[in-house]
Amino acid sequence: MRIGQYEINSRIFLAPMAGITDQPFRRLCSQLGAGLTFSEMMSTNPDVWHTEKSRLRLAHHAEIGINAVQIAGSEPTEIAEAAKINVAYGAQIIDINMGCPAKKVNKKMAGSALLREPQLVARILDAVVNAVDVPVTLKIRTGWDKTHKNFLQIAKIAEKAGISALTIHGRTRDCLFNGQAEYESIKAVKQAVFMPIIANGDITSPQKAKDVLDYTGADAVMIGRGSFGRPWLFQELKQFLETGDIIDLSIDEKCQLMLKHIEDLHHFYGEQKGYRIARKHVGWYLDQLTPGSNFKRTFNALSSTTEQLIALKDLVKSIR
């Protein structure tokens, strides 16, 4: 599929997720088969652009593949300016967040709260598309709640504005992450517009990815929570969609991917932040590799990157 001038070589994308899709995780997922990965959501508020967190999110050196950056805000001029700044820092695709269900985001009239204001959506999309010379994409939910589903209206506004691709998470904001994703809504959008459509929600296995693509007609699928502690899922999905073959990495191969991820994470964040951020990722890996193990508690008590790597290597030796 194409997004603007870019040919994407895999139909499996990594979703933008705050606190998750930092550069080390994006690089790993790209190496394992993700055709496109999105950065963590960047606020368009200029007051926070100079923080350490923003500095790391703006770090686009050493990216693999196309550099797609997600931004979130509610003021058209501010969002357009943020898009230009990110392009200046190396963004090759700008993604606009209108799907985040978090209260702290919605209180600022950003994320999925914007779905309640279609006219504002149109102004934001027009402003950003006209501000940058890179493809602009959009991520939404199906609506604010079950009585206010306006995904078709938003999709048509997006297409008119020149949005290059639309990702739809098959839930309303009110659903958060509960219940089942409504793939029939994604199918309806695919039938109503001509731009590429990316299906998102509950895609956690190769067969599920194929079923969703077949049912909705979507051009690609986007993986979010299913990738936690399972970056090899991208390799499994890509192999299955291309050949129909199921691959299952060995425990040792998965452990080596975990070690590589944590080493890269430590290097990216440094000693003080690295060991803290590693804890959640290792917890997710352990849920896959050694469910029920007491090692998680031991690992979380460690307070240096060196101690963490020694402990992880000892664990790997014990479970091979």
Swiss-Prot record:
EC number(s) in its UniProt entry? 1.3.1.-
Keywords attached to this entry: Flavoprotein, FMN, NADP, Oxidoreductase, RNA-binding, tRNA processing, tRNA-binding
Primary enzyme class: oxidoreductase
Q: Does the keyword Zinc-finger apply?
A: no
The record's section on SUPFAM superfamilies has: FMN-linked oxidoreductases
CDD domains in the record, alphabetically?
A: DUS_like_FMN
Q: Which reaction does it catalyse?
A: a 5,6-dihydrouridine in tRNA + NAD(+) = a uridine in tRNA + NADH + H(+); a 5,6-dihydrouridine in tRNA + NADP(+) = a uridine in tRNA + NADPH + H(+)
MF terms from GO for this chain are: flavin adenine dinucleotide binding; FMN binding; tRNA binding; tRNA dihydrouridine synthase activity
Catalytic residues? C100 (proton donor)
Pfam families from the xrefs? Dus (PF01207)
Residues reported to bind FMN? P16, M17, A18, Q70, K139, N200, G201, D202, G224, R225
Please list the cofactors this protein needs: FMN
The protein's matches in PANTHER family, at most eight in alphabetical order, are given as: TRNA-DIHYDROURIDINE(47) SYNTHASE [NAD(P)(+)]-LIKE (PTHR45846:SF1)
- Give the protein's biological function: Catalyzes the synthesis of 5,6-dihydrouridine (D), a modified base found in the D-loop of most tRNAs, via the reduction of the C5-C6 double bond in target uridines.
Family affiliation: Belongs to the Dus family. DusB subfamily.
Q: What is this protein called?
A: tRNA-dihydrouridine synthase B
Q: Which organism is it from?
A: Haemophilus ducreyi (strain 35000HP / ATCC 700724)
- The gene designation is dusB
